[in-house]
Amino acid sequence: MGEREEVKLLGTWYSPVVIRAKIALRLKSVDYDYVEEDLFGSKSELLLKSNPIFKKVPVLIHNTKPVCVSLNIVEYIDETWNSSGSSILPSHPYDRALARFWSVFVDDKWLPTLMAAVVAKSEEAKAKGMEEVEEGLLQLEAAFIALSKGKSFFGGETIGFIDICLGSFLVLLKAREKLKNEKILDELKTPSLYRWANQFLSNEMVKNVVPDIDKVAKFIEEFEDRAQYIRCF
């Protein structure tokens, strides 16, 4: 790409969906300017102008053109900088379809279940919600075994689309485990997924991008009783 190319990312430090864009940019060795947004205060004019429909982060601005929605951004990065780094999406159409399917599963089924359990008021509702979260993780365990084919990641030897989609929530999960003294990723129940999580977070492309677990735990503790908590992620 040309020297005059301008890349800017609007985000919030604690947001898993923003982490997705950051990891993709890192994988593709893309230099960019980062703009921190305060979603609990006044949203910037740039954010409202760049994403007038959803008014949410992340937003990738590439040569003045905004790209919105986290997984859409990841695909855009993969296609735009296709000569840099390994491909994020698989090359075969069927494998790409599977990657998108499981990413939809994470965002449209598993994540809403997790967030409902997090904000549930009664212990009964929390317990039921966490059972459903565990069921989803068992399904993801089976998917990992099938898709990774004995390799380190859902994408095989390298971090791919599903890895970014699910892996972006690992710091949140570990922060809750630490804060609540509860196990979400269980080494005995989902051993392959447990190993994958450790490999993902220790990967050079990830560990300097994701926020500190203790910092996220403190943030959760401060905001989880507020109605706005759900907006954090």
Swiss-Prot record:
What reaction gets catalysed by this protein?
A: RX + glutathione = an S-substituted glutathione + a halide anion + H(+)
The keyword Glycosyltransferase appears for this protein: no
Q: Does the keyword Phosphoprotein apply?
A: yes
Q: Which residues form the GST C-terminal domain?
A: 92-219
Q: Which residues bind glutathione?
A: S15, P16, S42, K43, K56, V57, V69, S70
Location of the protein in the cell:
Cytoplasm, Cytosol
Q: What does this protein do?
A: May be involved in the conjugation of reduced glutathione to a wide number of exogenous and endogenous hydrophobic electrophiles and have a detoxification role against certain herbicides.
By what name is this protein known? Glutathione S-transferase U15
Organism of this sequence: Arabidopsis thaliana
Q: Which gene encodes it?
A: GSTU15
